[in-house]
């Protein structure tokens, strides 16, 4: 909202200095600082409120060291992250930008699903929370909305080349400048480590013959649904020990922030020879607010945690990361900058699959990991959770750097 106020001051009243709000970098810095302050200063008040309302974590007996000490710790702390993210976004972002609208919808949508899940667990004393089928329906619903908007909305365009112009002389010694390519709808995405690193989902339907491109949504929307569901569930599984989900998510989002900034800037995208996505740079403001909120939340969530984010936070985090990756056409790189989420999810899938297979084959279930998700495996091996979290953060940073390197490494 302040963006529009200062825009009025600048363009209508011609007030000196107010034009600084036109710069994404300036607004991103303000969004980060405000979200950090909100999550640290007001976070304590939210925690005290949750404690007074007896919104405490119910700990399942898993045989893990120190787990009983966590009983009664306030949960639903994801409300802090949501609040500290949205307030700066409403103040400093261009709210008519389609990408900002999508991210706000994603935050509120996934936050609501997570909140209902936590509410049922705490106040209805149902340890299972919201039934899995309803979570999936919510995730699929968001996927359909995001996929449809990105595919059909005319404001979402992509320029798949560098935007360079060719200047040459004709035989008549006339200078000719080729016009810049037209920005158009596209379902292209980025493939890492490949020279001509773009793949169009529409190509999957090339067997349909001429005009197959108009049916690309049949592939694109299911892909969006899968990514949102997978990443949000991966974030949910990662939220098992103090500071793990918030810290690794902050690293992932920082990597996405770099992708978003360069993809939305025609100069940087031209230099790096990457896909230019008009208007996507505005997401940098949202990302800055989101990172500030996550870091501020870590102030209280690091070991020993004073608050847990609950599904209110973890599902929201996963949904936001997924939508950011899809919007900036870096969803394939999720396996790198969200490598921790992938490892946690894979450990659960492998554990359950192997247990069922061995039970059917040998009459008794066997396990590959001492416990899944993966962080519990290391807890069972005797590692202190703070050491596990620190090492997972280090791995997350390495994977994020590797994903950023793909901008030039082909």
UniProtKB/Swiss-Prot annotation:
Pathway entry: Cell wall biogenesis; peptidoglycan biosynthesis
GO molecular function: metal ion binding; phospho-N-acetylmuramoyl-pentapeptide-transferase activity; UDP-N-acetylmuramoyl-L-alanyl-D-glutamyl-meso-2,6-diaminopimelyl-D-alanyl-D-alanine:undecaprenyl-phosphate transferase activity
Bilayer topology annotation: Multi-pass membrane protein
EC supergroup of this enzyme: transferase
Function: Catalyzes the initial step of the lipid cycle reactions in the biosynthesis of the cell wall peptidoglycan: transfers peptidoglycan precursor phospho-MurNAc-pentapeptide from UDP-MurNAc-pentapeptide onto the lipid carrier undecaprenyl phosphate, yielding undecaprenyl-pyrophosphoryl-MurNAc-pentapeptide, known as lipid I.
Family, as annotated: Belongs to the glycosyltransferase 4 family. MraY subfamily.
NCBIfam families in UniProt: mraY (TIGR00445)
Protein name: Phospho-N-acetylmuramoyl-pentapeptide-transferase
Lineage per the UniProt record: Bacteria, Pseudomonadati, Bacteroidota, Flavobacteriia, Flavobacteriales
